[in-house]
Amino acid sequence: MAGAWSSDCCEGCSSTNCTCGHKSKWGDSSLLGRRLSEDSSRHQLLQKWASMWSSVSGDASAACPERKRREEAAEPAEEDRPLVFLCSSCRRPLGDSLSWVASQEDTNCILLRCVTCNVSVNEEQILSKRKNENGCILETLYCTGCSLNLGYLYRCTPKDLDYKRDLFCLSVGAIESYVLGSSERQIVSEDKELFNLESRVEIEKSLKQMEDVLKALQTKLWEVESKLSFTSCKS
């Protein structure tokens, strides 16, 4: 894949914000927030991503005043920040929620319009064996760093599944998420580092050593001065 990001056409995609004008049964963002199975960790993770994305991709009329309030706030709420999807094995970034199209609850996958260059595509095409995907031709997606199987790219689909064509289907089990801007740790420069008990003890120890050295030098200086004065008196 060329460049830092690879982008594919979302022809027939189901995103409610897509400019192509096509919609499908599951395109409504409200469907992304449906309650999923509580006993499945993958379903819970998918639900979390879907609900976070739904909170920032609602109707434009309702989003305008909320967007104004977010712009005025110094720190955006965590649920309003974009998600970065990482390889679960080597933690390389694979994509983000800004290219989100939809989630597939039955297959535990998310559909993205584009991914990063860390996702490689095996151009060997295979027929999908998934339920209700008869006639779909797929290309396998791998992580360029660790070769982990990430999912599939839909290259050819029957008419009723056209919304999946040229979309990247990433398996929830192969990826992890990171909320952009959620890190709290800051690097403190050496000149601004706060004193603690250990550093105070070390400083006091160094000062004591310097004091001992100065006293020794002062004693040597007195000895030299005494010898010089004694020599001058004899002469």
UniProtKB/Swiss-Prot annotation:
Q: List the disulfide bonds.
A: none
InterPro entries given for it?
A: Mis18, Yippee/Mis18/Cereblon
Q: Which residues form a coiled coil?
A: none
Explain the purpose of this protein: Required for recruitment of CENPA to centromeres and normal chromosome segregation during mitosis.
Q: Which GO terms describe its cellular component?
A: CENP-A recruiting complex; chromatin; chromosome, centromeric region; cytosol; nucleoplasm; nucleus
Q: Which PANTHER family match?
A: NEUROGENIC PROTEIN MASTERMIND, PROTEIN MIS18-ALPHA
Which residue ranges does UniProt annotate as crossing the membrane?
A: none
Domain Mis18, residue spans: 82-180
Query: Which residues does Zn(2+) bind?
Result: 87, 90, 143, 146
Q: Keywords, A to Z?
A: Cell cycle, Cell division, Centromere, Chromosome, Isopeptide bond, Metal-binding, Mitosis, Nucleus, Phosphoprotein, Ubl conjugation, Zinc
Q: How does it assemble?
A: Homodimer, and heterodimer with OIP5/MIS18B. Identified in a complex containing MIS18A, OIP5/MIS18B, MIS18BP1, RBBP7 and RBBP4.
Q: Which GO terms describe its biological process?
A: cell division; CENP-A containing chromatin assembly; chromosome segregation; pericentric heterochromatin organization; protein localization to chromosome, centromeric region
Positions bearing the Glycyl lysine isopeptide (Lys-Gly) (interchain with G-Cter in SUMO2) cross-link: 164
Please give the organism: Bos taurus (Bovine)
User: How is this protein named in the record?
Assistant: Protein Mis18-alpha
MF terms (GO), sorted A to Z: identical protein binding; metal ion binding; protein-macromolecule adaptor activity
Family of the protein in this entry: Belongs to the mis18 family.
Residues with PTM Phosphoserine: 37, 40-41, 235
